[in-house]
Amino acid sequence: MSEAARPEKTKTERRLEKSVELNASPEQIWSALTDPKQLVQWFPLVARVTPGLGGKFFLSWGPDYEGEGEIISWEPGKRFGWKEPLGTIEFIIEARGGKTILRLVQSAFLSGEDWENEWFESTSYGWGFMLLSLHWMLERHPGADRQIRWPRQKTSLSREEAYARVFSAGAIFEIDARSLAAGTTYSLRTTTGESWSGTVEFAKPLRGICLSIRQLNDALLWFTIEGTPGKIDAQIWLSAWGVEESRLDAIHDKLAIRLRETLA
């Protein structure tokens, strides 16, 4: 059968929903979602917004990680959403008992390809970190500028092998990071000479781990393993507010070297 005659695979809707309770007003959250100056303090590296229904919403983490969508929901203080190639993303804002509930709803129409399944799982996992970053920006670092350091390394290793190498004792940490449990406190040393303590914000086997770091003014450090077999991408996101750039640069350079050596 020729490619032209091949029947198109049936696509089905996959939907993910997440919510977070925030000590912020609906107006503050609306600004965090729609003001480019606010967006870059918790979400992308670059943001551009053309306000209003039918406007454009552009997000970028660099040339390989960027996109633009059409705004499909624009109700100030209540609802904001945009359309992407695979589906839609909407945020619903609801004031409740002096706090605000922010609900994320993302739907995508997928045909079941391996890369689509991986994209959906990575997206669901990634939103956990992004919503945590929003919480950190609004409640712990209001008005502060975020600094991002983002070493990453591609590898042909399997996900299981990459995860085992990155999180085993002697790679990035001096302990086996696979033993860290979400919601617990930790105190450890890295193989780059840093002494860190804080809370394990979340952890997921074969995906990664997120730590808060007291020694970096309550920064967030997120390790994530993404990609399909043979095309694994190991990434370290360091989000810090109010920390000297030179200090973050030094940490980035050391982590990048260790990540490269670990996955070689």
Language-model features: locations:
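Surface-exposed beta-loop interaction hotspot
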Residues: 109-164
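Short beta-edge strand/loop motif at the mouth of beta-sheet-based domains
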Residues: 17, 24-28, 34-79, 146-157, ...
